[in-house]
């Protein structure tokens, strides 16, 4: 209801569209956020057009819009519809979710100087827009803006001034973008999910986190310990039809899935359950997997070698079995921190059942918040 009220106040759903843009102000490249009052700047333009998907609304999006607000009296933001957005790949937020986040930010930042519309085709209103006098673009989208101006010429309209804005770099050295966020590399401010100071270090879990790890990190499917197929069956029924990589952690969980005809894309095992060696009949068949790797990771720790293997496994196109010499219980932490959004992580919860987590931004934030409490050595 709150979203509908916001939409009624701020948005007119019209079939309008133009070019997709990502951008920032050059001030950010000097290490500063763009903070001067938007009301105190002399503006050169009346109405600026902005277009984009605005998935995982991030700092680059904010600075793009701020650039337009600094140079135009009024802005029109055109948001790609669901059908067009899905051509960019999976795990893109719905139009409603993207609109809600954008509108919330605009209401605090742009006051009454904006409209928001739905973008239903590549060019939309730009070729025939009679009141717009500028458009924002990055170097990649400038050619499309020239196409728009050619169509405006054919329609007897003056060209739009093209405001070129540079990209914003994330802390890993790439361009801050929604696609890199969906790939699980960075958050919406461009920060990596594993702090750089933790790279190459042995991470030891402090005792104060014991209770935290007793809380399931996803949806719990209950079932008896001596019949794991009960919980696993319920989990598989809840598994989305379209999902990312399936990662299973723990011998009982991995073998249970395999016995039910489901081969995880990535499996982590250590040959134990409750730190006791498994009977030979309960061991996972390694020959079922296309690739196998071994790694040392002592109990209560996360090693750099395990992190390297997790990253490697996530890049593979074939199934991977990772045999851990030590303990794999904490492996989900590295998976949650490094895997793309939409990845499915499944692991056993002692005496309760099986946990399934569909990797989203909330799960990544929780993983990072826990990791920063680990003691880094080396």
Question: Where do the model's predicted regions map?
Answer:
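Nucleotidyltransferase catalytic core that binds NTPs
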Residues: 1-233, 240-242, 251-254, 258-259, ...
């Amino acid at each position: 209801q709150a979203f509908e009220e916001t939409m009624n106040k701020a948005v007119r759903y019209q079939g309008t569209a133009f070019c997709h843009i990502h951008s920032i102000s050059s001030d950010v490249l000097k290490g500063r956020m763009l903070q001067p009052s938007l009301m105190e700047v002399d503006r050169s333009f009346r109405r600026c057009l902005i277009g984009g998907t605005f998935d995982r609304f991030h700092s680059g999006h904010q600075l793009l819009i701020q650039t337009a607000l600094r140079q135009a009296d009024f802005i029109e933001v055109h948001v790609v519809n669901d059908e067009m957005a899905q051509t960019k790949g999976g795990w893109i937020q719905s139009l409603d979710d993207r609109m809600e986040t954008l509108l919330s930010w605009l209401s605090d930042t742009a006051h009454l100087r904006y409209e928001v519309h739905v973008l239903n085709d590549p060019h939309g209103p730009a070729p025939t827009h009679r009141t717009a006098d500028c458009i924002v673009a990055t170097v990649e989208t400038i050619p499309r803006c020239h196409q728009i101006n050619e169509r405006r010429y054919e329609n007897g309209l003056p060209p739009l001034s093209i405001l070129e804005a540079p990209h914003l770099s994330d802390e890993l050295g790439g361009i801050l973008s929604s696609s890199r966020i969906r790939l699980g590399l960075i958050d919406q401010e461009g920060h990596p999910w594993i702090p750089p100071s933790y790279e190459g270090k042995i991470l030891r879990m402090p005792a104060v986190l014991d209770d935290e790890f007793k809380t399931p990190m996803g949806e719990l499917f209950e079932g008896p310990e001596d019949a794991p197929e009960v919980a696993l069956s319920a989990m598989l029924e809840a598994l989305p039809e379209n999902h990312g990589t399936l990662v299973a952690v723990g011998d009982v969980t991995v073998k249970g899935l395999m016995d039910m005809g489901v081969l995880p894309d990535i499996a982590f095992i250590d040959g134990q359950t409750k730190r006791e060696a498994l009977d030979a009949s309960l061991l996972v068949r390694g020959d079922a997997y296309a690739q196998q790797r071994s790694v040392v990771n002592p109990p209560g720790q996360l090693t750099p070698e395990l992190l390297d293997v997790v990253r490697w496994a996530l890049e593979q196109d074939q199934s991977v079995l990772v045999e851990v010499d030590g303990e794999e219980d904490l492996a989900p932490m590295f998976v949650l921190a490094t895997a793309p959004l939409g990845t499915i992580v499944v692991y056993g919860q002692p005496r309760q059942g099986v946990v399934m987590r569909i990797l989203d931004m909330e799960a990544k934030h929780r993983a990072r918040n826990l990791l920063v409490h680990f003691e880094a050595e080396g």
